[in-house]
């Protein structure tokens, strides 16, 4: 009621409606009685019609989200619906007198770091599986009627035929093709190690006893770099315990990669020994995307939310009874909204040391393309200073959409590769997307653990 009244007080004078889950509980508890209640569903038009008639017989029947596909989840399979099944459901909805708003009619892109996330289960998880953090991919193509790049799909033409038949109008079978281009391979010959240039990239550095969250640093997206130094205590084996990592942390000791920790996923211990001169610990935490649906939105802070502790192992394999708390941190904000401070060289990138790569390529201005990054493992890409988004070898997305309006005759490409393998990085722009390539299934636990 407060939300509606605020909109009215601000001069909004259009009809209001709500989008509700396909359950009578959600209809009755997620809406106001005098507000037009739309329903979100796919397929079961008869059941939805009965629920809508029972709840609001005085309003037109409205599919506020008529699902034609689903968003892509990193590490999960691309969920597709066939053109025939969507067109058949659309026909039944029209014949039932249901007004339809396709979700999505046209796919889109979560450029930069703007992808969302869920606290839920993967679509192939078994019933009763625990909820976990699931980030969405950069692409929001969602197998829509019109693709991420504006290309009408077979699903579009199938639904177009259904609508023409329902309206008793002739079917226009003409097709539209959105042009796309392929470039020559792009050699990224210049490098800039991230940890070496963190001070230049940082927008704010704060010293604190315990790690600060991204929000307390006044930062919304990107990365945080936490740094501390541990003196030499003894020669025992130490394990770093990161409590509440949000969302993915790369750990380094004196510049050497020690391991990765991921939110809600078990991993091998991040272990090390402290040399006589001591050890500098750097923890690079990536915000993988903010939860955009459900109660968990309000709790989704980013960074290291809890304490960092040391688990100490004795020579006989036992551990001391309590943990040692790690204090005295430097917290650096790395939103990566401005890369102009980077200083590149032609030195090779060190293996497992996050590094920016830069190269140049020629393209036809105004013509779309898709940046193929399957040669990398995980990172982000910028073309002519514009943040395209993330890539990740776990799939299913392997290309990033590049709108033609971003391109010039000569272009600069910068790629941040979080896990370089020590070899030169070469990528290419191709004329088609790769959005459903996945080499293994849902569990990302292999992404967490010790080097």
Regions flagged by a language model, labelled:
Residues 236-252, 281, 361-384, 391-392, ...:
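Aromatic-lined ligand-binding clefts that engage carbohydrates, nucleic acids, or primary amines
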């Amino acid at each position: 009621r407060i939300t509606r009244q605020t909109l009215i007080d601000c001069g909004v004078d259009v009809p209001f409606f709500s989008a509700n889950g396909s359950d009578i509980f959600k209809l009755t508890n997620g809406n106001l009685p005098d507000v037009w209640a739309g329903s979100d569903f796919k397929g079961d038009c008869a059941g939805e019609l009965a629920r809508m008639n029972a709840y609001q017989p005085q309003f037109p029947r409205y599919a506020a989200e008529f699902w034609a596909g689903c968003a892509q989840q990193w590490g999960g399979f691309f969920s597709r619906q066939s053109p025939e099944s969507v067109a058949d459901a659309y026909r039944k909805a029209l014949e039932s007198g249901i007004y339809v708003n396709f979700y999505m009619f046209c796919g889109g892109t979560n450029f930069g770091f703007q992808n969302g996330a869920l606290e839920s289960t993967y679509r192939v998880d078994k019933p009763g599986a625990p909820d976990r953090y699931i980030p969405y991919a950069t692409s929001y193509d969602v197998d829509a009627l019109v693709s991420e790049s504006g290309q009408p799909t077979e699903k579009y033409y199938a639904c177009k035929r259904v609508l023409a038949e329902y309206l008793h109008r002739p079917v226009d079978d003409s097709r539209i093709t959105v042009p796309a281009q392929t470039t020559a391979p792009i050699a990224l010959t210049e490098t800039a190690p991230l940890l070496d240039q963190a001070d230049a990239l940082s927008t704010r550095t704060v010293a604190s006893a315990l790690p600060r969250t991204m929000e307390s640093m006044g930062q919304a997206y990107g990365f945080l770099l936490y740094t501390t130094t541990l003196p030499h205590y003894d020669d025992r084996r130490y394990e770093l315990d990161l409590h509440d990592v949000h969302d993915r942390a790369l750990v380094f000791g004196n510049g050497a990669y020690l391991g990765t920790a991921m939110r809600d996923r078990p991993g091998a211990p991040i272990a090390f020994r402290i040399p006589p001169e001591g050890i500098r610990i750097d923890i690079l935490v990536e915000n993988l995307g903010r939860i955009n649906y459900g109660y968990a939105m309000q709790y989704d802070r980013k960074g290291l939310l809890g304490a960092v502790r040391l688990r100490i192992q004795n020579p006989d394999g036992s551990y001391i009874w309590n943990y040692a708390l790690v204090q005295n941190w430097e917290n650096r904000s790395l939103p990566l909204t401005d890369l102009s401070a980077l200083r590149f060289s032609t030195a090779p990138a060190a293996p497992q040391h996050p590094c920016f790569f830069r190269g140049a390529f020629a393209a036809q201005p105004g013509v779309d393309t898709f940046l193929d990054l399957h040669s990398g493992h995980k990172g982000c890409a910028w073309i002519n200073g514009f943040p395209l988004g993330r890539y990740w070898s776990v799939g299913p997305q392997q290309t990033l959409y590049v709108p033609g309006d971003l391109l010039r005759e000569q272009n600069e490409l910068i790629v941040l590769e979080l896990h370089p393998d020590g070899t030169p990085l070469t990528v290419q722009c191709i004329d088609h997307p790769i959005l459903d390539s996945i080499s293994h299934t849902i569990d990302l636990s292999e992404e967490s653990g010790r080097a």
